[in-house]
Amino acid sequence: MIDDGIIAAIASGYVESAIGIIRVSGKNSIELLKKIFYPKKNTFEPYKIYHGFLKDSNQKIVDEVLVSVFKSPHSYTGEDSFEINCHGGLLIMQNVLDLVLKNGARLALPGEFTKRAFLNDKIDLLQANAIVNLIKAKTQKALDIAFGQLLKKNTTIIEELREKIIFLMAENEVLIDHPEEDLSDVDLNKRLLILNEITKLIQKLLKFSEKGKYFFEGVNVAIIGKPNVGKSSLLNELTGHNRAIVTDIPGTTTDIVSETLNLNGIPIKILDTAGIRKHSNKIEYLGIKKSHEAIDEADIIIAVFDSSRILDKNDEDILNIIKNKKNVLIVLNKSDLKRKLLLPLNIDPIEISCTKKTGINTLKSRLYNMLIEDYNESEVVSLNTSQIIALKSALKHAKKIKKAYIDSLDPALISIDLQQLADYIEQIIGKIENEDILDNVFKNFCVGK
């Protein structure tokens, strides 16, 4: 699977800047450098920066540059590599890259440098995900979590999982090797106890990966309610500026209005939806249709009611929409007026007044607490889709093994299932034999990384 050919890319991005960086890596990359780079000293020592000129085959100067050299295995990719710091003009960077490509390199694919780092055992897949998140982080909290994952500060759950599975595998091998003698001091109850612990750890890892998704991918929050209850006013108060048009005319919002809020490190995309009621025209019908779509896609729903008016049919429709939804916050707006609205007893509403600007911080606090329930920053991880699928498969497999123990199946058969369980957990860190799956892991990286 390892391609050690020379790859190159503009690592600083194809944008005009003061300095541009062209990254090159692969077997014989230092020999390539000697063909095009003319410093005062042509013997390259690692971890030093050399000043000189890049020249083409006709000895024409392409640029005056600084070059840093890295020798295998002590480089980002684990291979011989170098980086050219040139002037940051678009044409200069392209000329430098073309010069490298003409002398034996090929253009790197997105994420190929990091893929080589993984294949050369410089990083595991958890750290690869962390690198993506470092680049894409939108908040300081997301950046801190990504650094923790890169430095392997939050992989204790996975290590604990591996240890417990290895223990069961080793104990099962004793039963296979000595079928006539009961040399194991582990009884059925202890095996089942360990499997229960494995199941809980997998569930915990899935839960914390969901928290990681919030920090790195953000959360969709839909504000819903009948017309003229203050949805647009609430959007403006949450975001701190007048993003949505606010009038006394019901049905002003006919399309989804969105704005982003940084809520204690979590990027929140707030959607102000059209008021839900029996539509009066086609435009309003389309707006209400989009509101229902936003409700289905939202991670959290904020249902807004006018506390100064009695409950009506439109309010009841809203309550019916949210009754089977998991993450819902009920908000009573216009709390500065006399309250006339009566809600079912099992509802714990948040009273606010957009006019008086009260209760907004309480709403933000409730929203944040709903997102980070049972949250532990040191254990939050970011997993890609294939890793989450592997975890869910591991969860099902653990239950299958538990049944096999209870049914007293042959240890040789249980051994196969234990190995499969171990393989699923290994996929989280990096045991992937399918090249297509591996390519898919790194496709979301930018070129040059």
Predicted regions and their residues:
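Conserved beta-strand segments of alpha/beta enzyme cores
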Residues: 106, 267-269, 348
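Inter-motif core of Ras-like GTPase G domains
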Residues: 284-308
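A glycine-rich (often HGG/GG-containing) alpha/beta subdomain
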Residues: 1-144, 148, 152, 163, ...
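Generic enzyme active-site microenvironment
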Residues: 270, 304, 331
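C-terminal-of-GTPase-core extension/linker across diverse P-loop GTPases
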Residues: 2-10, 14, 55, 140-259, ...
